[in-house]
């Protein structure tokens, strides 16, 4: 298929495939933009024993150390009563999981560190809290790209339980 473009004095013909395919071929990577849906009731503040457990995860141990120091300084400065976890600032399992995802993607040899990489929380829906992964693969070939995307999400789906989070699932129970 071709498309005709009128350019001032003459008409040019272009193959549609060449207009569509060129951007991907000339880019530095293929975009991965996909979400995990987290069950809202599984999100919670982290207790000190849970924080200590997560410090053993290499990718996030430095983050947890610096964040705990920052939070403790804030809570001390404002004389926050921490006998109630709800008071003051705290780490959440979902917040730490988002950092884990970003660090995992940064460390992955097949993601392109020169392009945008982020993990963000989108607006909650009736199907849960979307945690969106936005990054680029180094390899643009479709089957390799799909394999990489699957490998990343296999890992993340397996990692959810270590943060005491649950993925949203529609109930199979149907009552009349």
Task: Please place each PLM-identified region on the residue numbering.
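Long, non-transmembrane cytosolic or organellar matrix-exposed soluble domains/tails
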Residues: 65, 69-70, 77-176
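Soluble accessory domains appended to multi-pass membrane transport proteins
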Residues: 1-80
């Amino acid at each position: 298929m071709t498309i005709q473009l009128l350019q001032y004095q003459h008409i040019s013909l272009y193959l549609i495939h060449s207009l569509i395919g060129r951007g991907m071929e000339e880019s530095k990577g293929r975009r991965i933009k996909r979400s995990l849906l987290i069950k809202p009731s599984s999100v919670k503040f982290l207790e000190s024993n849970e924080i200590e457990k997560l410090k053993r995860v290499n990718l996030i141990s430095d983050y947890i150390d610096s964040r705990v120091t920052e939070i403790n300084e804030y809570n001390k400065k404002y004389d926050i009563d921490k006998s109630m976890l709800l008071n003051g600032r705290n780490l959440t399992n979902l917040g730490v999981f988002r950092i884990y995802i970003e660090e995992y993607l940064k460390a992955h040899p097949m993601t392109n560190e020169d392009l945008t990489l982020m993990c963000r929380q989108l607006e909650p829906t009736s199907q849960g809290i979307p945690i969106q992964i936005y990054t680029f693969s180094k390899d643009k070939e479709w089957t390799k790209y799909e394999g990489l995307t699957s490998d990343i999400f296999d890992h993340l789906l397996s990692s959810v339980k270590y943060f005491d989070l649950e993925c949203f699932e529609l109930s199979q129970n149907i009552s009349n």
